[in-house]
């Protein structure tokens, strides 16, 4: 990981201005209602469930969520099916942060998670195969200009809580709140240390 956040692609390319983000969203809101746009929150839950099913660390899941949000910050929800983009982001994040999740495990996990946890929204089988995910990965990498480094609020949060001297009491709750921030646009709008500081 790059040693300096202020010189990283995360800061230089992916801390977005709120007005620019809203302007990009207006394209979608011409065709989708605000409620339909909440699908972004729903799919962060899908990514979380998929990562948990694969037993990935929370940082890998958070990275996948950031990749997902970056893609849909620049492209419409109609450009690529979020059902395909969610496991693609998990796959790419696992490669970047953890080590490759096998093709069969990823497809089996996506099928299982959609069938068991989200069957109310997806009554059919998971329609994609690994070749679709690998093709989608190219689109994702192209959009992000291969800038895969993501800084997270976890490390600064840990430092802030340690400085306060109340680790046992504060850290579990603060960690869960950080996880919940990934359902919002905060990871696109603010540096991670600011998110951690606000939570602390």
Predicted regions located by residue number:
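A eukaryotic "domain-start" boundary segment
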Residues: 1-59
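Structured all-alpha helical bundle cores of eukaryotic regulatory proteins
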Residues: 35-198
């Amino acid at each position: 990981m790059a040693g300096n956040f202020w010189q990283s692609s995360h800061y230089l390319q992916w801390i977005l201005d709120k007005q620019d983000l809203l302007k990009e969203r207006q394209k979608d809101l011409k065709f989708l209602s605000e409620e339909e746009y909440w699908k972004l929150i729903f799919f962060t839950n899908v990514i979380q469930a998929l990562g948990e099913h694969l037993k990935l660390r929370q940082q890998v899941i958070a990275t996948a969520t950031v990749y997902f949000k970056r893609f849909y910050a620049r492209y419409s929800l109609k450009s690529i099916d979020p059902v395909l983009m969610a496991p693609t982001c998990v796959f790419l994040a696992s490669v970047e942060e953890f080590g490759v999740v096998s093709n069969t495990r990823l497809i089996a996990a996506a099928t299982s998670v959609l069938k068991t946890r989200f069957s109310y929204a997806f009554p059919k089988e998971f329609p994609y195969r690994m070749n679709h995910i690998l093709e989608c990965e190219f689109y994702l990498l192209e959009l992000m200009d291969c800038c895969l480094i993501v800084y997270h609020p976890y490390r600064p949060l840990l430092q802030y809580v340690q400085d306060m001297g109340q680790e046992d009491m504060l850290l579990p709750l603060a960690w869960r709140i950080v996880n919940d921030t990934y359902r919002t646009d905060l990871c696109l709008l603010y540096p991670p240390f600011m998110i951690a500081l606000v939570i602390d």
